[in-house]
Amino acid sequence: MLDNTRLRIAMQKSGRLSDESRELLARCGIKINLQQQRLIAFAENMPIDILRVRDDDIPGLVMDGVVDLGIIGENVLEEELLTRRAQGEDPRYKTLRRLDFGGCRLSLAMSVDDEYSGPQCLQNSRIATSYPHLLKKYLDEQRVSFKSCLLNGSVEVAPRAGLADAICDLVSTGATLEANGLREVEVIYRSKACLIQRDGEMPANKQLLIDKLMTRIQGVIQARESKYIMLHAPSERLEEIITLLPGAERPTVLPLAGDKSRVAMHMVSSETLFWETMEKLKALGASSILVLPIEKMME
């Protein structure tokens, strides 16, 4: 039986978000032995229990107060929210933050042989999907009537099997659609993983742990988005070089032995367009440019 004084976190047991959720917790310093068949794991160094469940069970576990936190795709969360509202419920939860993984899109797709001129051409079509409420919300906004064909897997085979005229399914690269003779025609929802919390006041010990976890998650995400840069540069070009580096604070500047015209610069910067940035740095006279990954970061 689980100890109610420990923080309970639900995450996907296997699937699209499982590995990255596990990596996030590990990089936050939570030591957990996640053996393949165990559905409950206990942190060795913090009062945290991990429940490994199906992804579509996670929103309900949080909304019903069974667990304190959940790592879940926004698409699954929104579908559960719409489902419960359609049943007359008033589901409550808090979104603590969007995470930097699990990106995908929910899209309409049709046969490569069919013409598509916009959502209106789907009027009265039969559409196969695992996300009936998200699909209905979108097509209601477009004032398009349709017939839903609910499938919980292998949605992409529905048109060839004669079950549907089109599909609404998750797309990452589009390779699965192409393999089944389909093409993406409309994106109706963009999703990433997010961290959610149950509604209601949290006991002080759990809230303290959540605050600590949030600080660490922020540090992990910032570290993944940033790089530590070291370079040599002409002293008179310092300000131009600093301007080139997005997100950089004022750098550490050190003299170079035996060369008063140049300095060493150390700084943290985002990696956005960094190959282009490196070429511009070189054009300004920078040399010995090193870009290093950052494991942990805290402001």
Curated annotation (Swiss-Prot):
State the compartments where it is located: Cytoplasm
Q: What's the subunit arrangement here?
A: Equilibrium between an active dimeric form, an inactive hexameric form and higher aggregates. Interconversion between the various forms is largely reversible and is influenced by the natural substrates and inhibitors of the enzyme.
Organism expressing this protein natively:
Erwinia tasmaniensis (strain DSM 17950 / CFBP 7177 / CIP 109463 / NCPPB 4357 / Et1/99)
Q: What is this protein called?
A: ATP phosphoribosyltransferase
Q: According to the UniProt entry, what is the EC number of this protein?
A: 2.4.2.17
A GO cellular-component term linked to this record: cytoplasm
Q: How is its activity regulated?
A: Feedback inhibited by histidine.
PANTHER family in alphabetical order: ATP PHOSPHORIBOSYLTRANSFERASE, ATP PHOSPHORIBOSYLTRANSFERASE ATP-PRTASE
Fetch the Pfam families from UniProt: HisG, HisG_C
Q: What family does this chain come from, according to its entry? A: Belongs to the ATP phosphoribosyltransferase family. Long subfamily.
Q: What does this protein do?
A: Catalyzes the condensation of ATP and 5-phosphoribose 1-diphosphate to form N'-(5'-phosphoribosyl)-ATP (PR-ATP). Has a crucial role in the pathway because the rate of histidine biosynthesis seems to be controlled primarily by regulation of HisG enzymatic activity.
**Could you tell me the Gene Ontology terms of the biological process aspect for this record?**
L-histidine biosynthetic process
- Pathway membership: Amino-acid biosynthesis; L-histidine biosynthesis; L-histidine from 5-phospho-alpha-D-ribose 1-diphosphate: step 1/9
The protein's UniProt keywords, in alphabetical order, are: Amino-acid biosynthesis, ATP-binding, Cytoplasm, Glycosyltransferase, Histidine biosynthesis, Magnesium, Metal-binding, Nucleotide-binding, Transferase
Give the cofactors, semicolon-separated.
Mg(2+)
Q: Which domain of life is it from?
A: Bacteria
Q: Which GO terms describe its molecular function?
A: ATP binding; ATP phosphoribosyltransferase activity; magnesium ion binding
- Write down the InterPro entries for this protein, in alphabetical order: ATP-PRT_HisG_long (IPR020621), ATP_PRibTrfase_cat (IPR013820), ATP_PRibTrfase_CS (IPR018198), ATP_PRibTrfase_HisG (IPR001348), HisG_C (IPR013115), N-reg_PII-like_a/b (IPR011322), N-reg_PII/ATP_PRibTrfase_C (IPR015867)
The record's catalysed reaction(s) read: 1-(5-phospho-beta-D-ribosyl)-ATP + diphosphate = 5-phospho-alpha-D-ribose 1-diphosphate + ATP
